[in-house]
Design a protein with these regions (language model features):
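ABC ATPase NBD coupling module
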Residues: 57-74, 98, 206, 210
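ABC-type ATPase nucleotide-binding domains, specifically the catalytic core motifs of the NBD
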Residues: 86, 90-106, 114
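Hydrophobic anchor residue at the start of the ABC signature
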Residues: 138
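Internal alpha/beta loop-helix hairpins
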Residues: 176-246
Length: 337
């Protein structure tokens, strides 16, 4: 879908519907739900195009706007995807009414088994915990043999996505705010911010090598420094990066030239902290601690200049009486873009 406007929300997104699980990740108001609703046909963009596979289902200029029922997209959103007065089995049988009785019964039994719901077939939706209810909703949706599955619910978990991968080979677009679950369960990651697609690609590749500052911020690379490439050493596989307050040794930057302006990023959990009197090493920066925030398992340390580190509570207990601090930005943990 590209360049769509829905009410006051503007979407400038070119997002391919490809087989496998694509996670849509971004802050509230980024356009994740609006994207799915436009694809499904529940909202009508003022302009733009929507394609499902090779089929154009919406084109504002050409006057094409297929109704939702003809797009063959299964959409699971805030509304319950199950009939509350029916059991799980009855819900699936209702969705499978295109087949003859014996074939329908067989297909429903197979789908219940795939989603590990055989013990819940006579239960009603209200009697299921949220995550199992969502499994039943997905199973019912797949009985209609959709071309694509759109999931806009926060109850999706690793078990559901694993079962879904074995039950459906087509495109899945899944809205989530769980970055760890994206990493473990999605094939691709689409990063949305302000109605724009700011990053897209295989999950691990995009998490390790974000394409922009906006993408880096979304995937929790909180330490970001504008820098100038002051040197390139292919023999040592290194670069020299001049930031505003310090100079860093980074990875060799193939395709870049000396003098190029870049951004350097590092996750807070990859920053190491040392006592001020320790002999400095590579990428050690003397820093002043300005804020400490205790969390359930970690402590977040924020230093003058904006660098933040996330360390274990045990490590902080050993170092809390430091008279001075040095932060270490390991070269292997730096991301340059």
């Amino acid at each position: 879908m590209t360049h769509a406007r829905i009410g006051n929300a503007r979407l400038e997104i070119d997002l391919p519907l490809v087989d496998g699980i694509t996670a849509l990740f971004g802050p509230a108001g980024a356009g994740k739900s609006a994207t799915l609703e436009a694809i499904a046909g529940f909202t009508r963009p003022e302009r733009g195009r929507v394609l499902i596979g090779d089929a154009i289902v919406f084109d504002a200029d050409a006057g094409v706007n297929l109704p939702a029922r003809r797009r063959r997209c299964a959409w699971l959103g805030a509304r319950d995807g199950l009939f509350p007065h029916m059991t799980v089995r009855q819900n699936l049988l209702f969705a499978a009414d295109r087949w003859a009785r014996l074939e329908r019964t067989k297909r429903v039994a197979e789908m219940l088994a795939r989603f590990e719901l055989a013990d819940a077939l006579e239960m009603r939706p209200r009697d299921l915990p949220p995550q199992r209810r969502l499994r039943a909703e997905v199973a019912r949706a797949l009985m209609t043999e959709p071309k694509a599955l759109l999931i806009d619910q926060q109850d999706a978990d690793e078990a559901l996505l694993r079962l879904l991968r074995g039950a459906f080979a087509g495109p899945v677009l899944w809205v989530t705010d769980d970055l760890d679950l994206c990493y473990s369960s999605a094939d691709r990651l689409a990063l949305l911010d302000g109605g724009r697609l700011v990053g897209y690609g295989p999950v691990r590749e995009l998490m390790e090598h974000p394409e922009s500052v906006e993408a880096a911020r979304l995937i929790a690379i909180s330490n970001l420094y504008p820098a100038t490439i002051a040197g390139l050493d292919p023999g040592r596989n290194q670069s020299r990066l001049e930031c505003a307050d310090f100079v860093l040794t980074g990875p060799y930057l193939k395709g870049h030239l000396k003098g190029d302006r870049v951004w350097v990023g590092i996750r807070a959990e990859d920053v190491r902290v040392h006592a001020g009197e320790m002999e400095p090493g590579v990428n050690f920066v003397a820093s002043q601690l300005v804020r400490m925030t205790e969390r359930s398992r970690t402590v977040r340390l924020e230093f003058a200049g904006g660098t933040a580190a996330e360390i274990s509570r045990e490590q902080y207990a050993r170092q809390k009486d430091n008279k001075g601090w040095q932060v270490e930005l390991p070269p292997a943990a730096l991301r340059v873009f």
